[in-house]
């Protein structure tokens, strides 16, 4: 009877344990499953710091198709800012632009050969509808010819610090599809190519330097030349804009692309709760391995879900934070012999859930403001920057950025919390004399000690 009771208790306990721990174990497994992005290359980036949150083959050079137009946008917005080009400036199509714009097998708004179009009209057609004729028109407006513009594109890429890129035309079309009208100096079989890292870097700089790009990139529908015989409805190819078929909360850019060479590509950006992310997928594919328009949005959705669900913006160290044991720095030639220092701003960072304690604060002092002995020199103003505080990451992987110089994006100034006036000559003289006597006494003491 006792043995039966023990068996009954054993089975009851086993059932309870299964009910208690079974679902928990399944949940942990699901949450820790790796992110499976079906694309030849992909990247997810914090748009504030340039920190890489996810990467796959990010330095592999691949076709970029119409994502090319982001560089054309950058150069146009540069020219607008520099007042070399005006939004209301008029343009009449060249023979080439006219012919290209009439090709309805490509993304286009047909332009009249004798028509007059504003730069803004052409820009909207390019940014919303990916119109290729309008894109070459912009290239001609800025540089006089697409050939000259292509040189500007490559020069700007170098200036922006991009690696692994080559531009051969302004649109992203395959040169072979330009029917012999590819830019002079390029060949029929050439393509625009970049790595996912370079593409994300271009998006990062576009958003930093020209945030106004989102005003147009976020327009889901617009009518070109509305109210005229030439009007044509332009539907944004970015189907992740809210209200469209793959609408995603917070998405407001940037650019899709497709050619047979590049496959379906998309550089996206979305903002939620003060956090902006940048994503790139190149040659995105469905479960069968086929590249499709839908796949580029579904794979991007995976990236955004990962970023917004697994990371949050945290104030790791507030303004006024003082590192324990390093609250003060020594000062020479001042009325005071030391000064308190603290951070001049909040140190905010996009942190993966559960990793808040994986970051260690580190002071880096400005050597130009220090003596060889490591002391500050009076006078010092309150709030004067004497260095910066950055972070060391103690997690499994190192912090990765689009480029090494972006490490500076996770630092805040280290400032003095009070003014230190320079001591007058008498005080400095007495200190010097006092120092002399101290040195003399120390020397004598050492000598006497040596006799004993």
From Swiss-Prot:
GO CC list: extracellular region
Enzyme active site: 66 (acyl-ester intermediate), 69 (proton acceptor), 130
Catalyzed reaction equations: Preferential cleavage: (Ac)2-L-Lys-D-Ala-|-D-Ala. Also transpeptidation of peptidyl-alanyl moieties that are N-acyl substituents of D-alanine
EC number(s) on file: 3.4.16.4
Molecular function per GO: serine-type D-Ala-D-Ala carboxypeptidase activity
Domain of life: Bacteria
This protein's UniProt keywords: Carboxypeptidase, Cell shape, Cell wall, Cell wall biogenesis/degradation, Hydrolase, Peptidoglycan synthesis, Protease, Secreted, Signal, Sporulation
Residues where substrate binds: 255
Signal sequence bounds: 1-30
Pathway: Cell wall biogenesis; peptidoglycan biosynthesis
Gene Ontology biological process terms, A to Z: cell wall organization; peptidoglycan biosynthetic process; proteolysis; regulation of cell shape; sporulation resulting in formation of a cellular spore
Location of the protein in the cell: Secreted, Cell wall
Gene3D superfamilies: D-Ala-D-Ala carboxypeptidase, C-terminal domain, DD-peptidase/beta-lactamase superfamily
Statement: the UniProt record of this protein carries the keyword Glycoprotein: no
Function of the molecule: Removes C-terminal D-alanyl residues from sugar-peptide cell wall precursors.
Record family assignment: Belongs to the peptidase S11 family.
UniProt name for this protein: D-alanyl-D-alanine carboxypeptidase DacA
Protein species of origin: Geobacillus stearothermophilus (Bacillus stearothermophilus)
